Amino acid sequence: MSSQLQQVIEAAWEDRANLSVASAPAAVREAVAHVLGELDAGRIRVAERQAVGQWQVNQWVKKAVLLSFRLNDNVVMGDGALTFFDKVPSKFGGMDEAALRATGVRVVPPAVARRGSFIARGAILMPSYVNIGAYVDEGTMVDTWATVGSCAQIGKNVHLSGGVGIGGVLEPLQAGPTIIEDNCFIGARSEVVEGVVVEENSVISMGVYIGQSTKIYDRATGEVTYGRIPSGSVVVSGNLPSADGKYSLYCAVIVKRVDAQTRAKTSINDLLRG
């Protein structure tokens, strides 16, 4: 089934300039809707983990998400005084208590998750936003005013602190999703974007900004890398001087590896889960 879906999506993607709400063939509509349903249920993912720091991106799934915006028109949605006009419905809209209990997810008002995102059992959504195509795994907390961007992949037992931004892939268009692996702690108001991978058990301090062009400086080795935080790193914001010493530019600094003291300060609180 997956290979047939992929073929339909790939063909539709090549013909996307000719697709519209009015003209799209039924087979394309059904394929895109099916992919979004599978994403919503967590049976299909935009990216799948192969090993620590190694992910396979399913580009055709991302293409299906993008095609959905071409195939669907804006509609009025909402409740009471809150009215919206959009192409993507709420993930939890229309669910009764039994259905919500069955998800195993705690959703604190006014948290929003769009349909086509997956939120695993034991996750907590404080007043936050989870975009289409995103995957939030078990035991993760998305704290107040945090944003999980389109198609971002968030691992198990992750804490995204208040105001954190995890970048999406839809605009500007990115090749791969931003990925936060298992047991990571992302400090308040930090931003991880542009397909950066934060490997498991890492701690990103408050107010750290990491994109593909951000220098990542390892204090222990003096090495500068881009686009990936190694497993078990503790990262803070910093600056590196220019070659002529006339100015400095922002960087992210790996100051040490996670130890017992770091873990004690950033461990998740089981009292808040369950």
Curated annotation (Swiss-Prot):
User: What would be one Gene Ontology cellular-component term for the protein?
Assistant: cytoplasm
Looking at the record's lineage, which domain of life comes first? Bacteria
Q: What is its EC number?
A: 2.3.1.117
Name its cellular compartments: Cytoplasm
User: Which InterPro entries does the protein's record reference?
Assistant: DapD_Trfase_Hexpep_rpt_fam, Hexapep, Hexapep_transf_CS, THP_succinylTrfase_dom1, THP_succinylTrfase_N_sf, Trimer_LpxA-like_sf
Q: What class of enzyme is it?
A: transferase
Q: Which UniProt keywords apply?
A: Acyltransferase, Amino-acid biosynthesis, Cytoplasm, Diaminopimelate biosynthesis, Lysine biosynthesis, Repeat, Transferase
The record's section on HAMAP family has: DapD
Name the family the entry cites. Belongs to the transferase hexapeptide repeat family.
Which NCBIfam families does this entry report, sorted A to Z? dapD, PRK11830.1
The name on file for this protein is 2,3,4,5-tetrahydropyridine-2,6-dicarboxylate N-succinyltransferase
Q: What species was this sequence derived from?
A: Leptothrix cholodnii (strain ATCC 51168 / LMG 8142 / SP-6) (Leptothrix discophora (strain SP-6))
Q: Which gene encodes it?
A: dapD
